[in-house]
């Protein structure tokens, strides 16, 4: 099984950007922990981060036929990007939306996601552990494990 971890704008600043909201772990810390989990689960994990919408769309296109599932934290593009939504729908790869903060407890413009209604699930509000929960959920879904 192959998964793609896709992170959008400003996620590269984790650990520095508003640590009271997003925590002190860096993106590298999160990726390392998920790589360990993936290894234990016999899953291959690819990672990609970009601050550019077009690069994220292009990476989703490249994933077609090469990955079984996508974990995506689209950052601010969650609330604005029809292009990213269309790319995810176009490749028809199951995906889970993930956020460190609870987007529903923040500013009203963050309450709407252009991805959530087509995602297998959405995990938010648990800091860096949101990624672990999303990983477990996606792997279990792809393996046909019922809750």
UniProtKB/Swiss-Prot annotation:
Binding site for substrate: 73, 79, 86, 100-101, 110
Domain of life from the UniProt record: Bacteria
UniProt xrefs under SUPFAM superfamilies: Type II 3-dehydroquinate dehydratase
Catalytic activity: 3-dehydroquinate = 3-dehydroshikimate + H2O
Amino-acid biosynthesis is among the record's keywords: yes
CDD domains (alphabetical): DHQase_II (cd00466)
Pathway given in the UniProt record: Metabolic intermediate biosynthesis; chorismate biosynthesis; chorismate from D-erythrose 4-phosphate and phosphoenolpyruvate: step 3/7
GO terms of molecular function: 3-dehydroquinate dehydratase activity
EC number(s) reported in the record: 4.2.1.10
Residues annotated as the enzyme's active site: 22 (proton acceptor), 99 (proton donor)
PROSITE patterns: DEHYDROQUINASE_II
One of the GO biological process terms: amino acid biosynthetic process
Site (Transition state stabilizer) residue list: 17
Record flagged with keyword Lyase: yes
Keyword terms, alphabetized: Amino-acid biosynthesis, Aromatic amino acid biosynthesis, Lyase
NCBIfam families documented for this protein: aroQ, PRK05395.1-1, PRK05395.1-2, PRK05395.1-3, PRK05395.1-4
HAMAP family linked: AroQ
UniProt subunit comment: Homododecamer.
Family: Belongs to the type-II 3-dehydroquinase family.
Function of the protein: Catalyzes a trans-dehydration via an enolate intermediate.
UniProt name for this protein: 3-dehydroquinate dehydratase
Protein species of origin: Synechococcus sp. (strain WH7803)
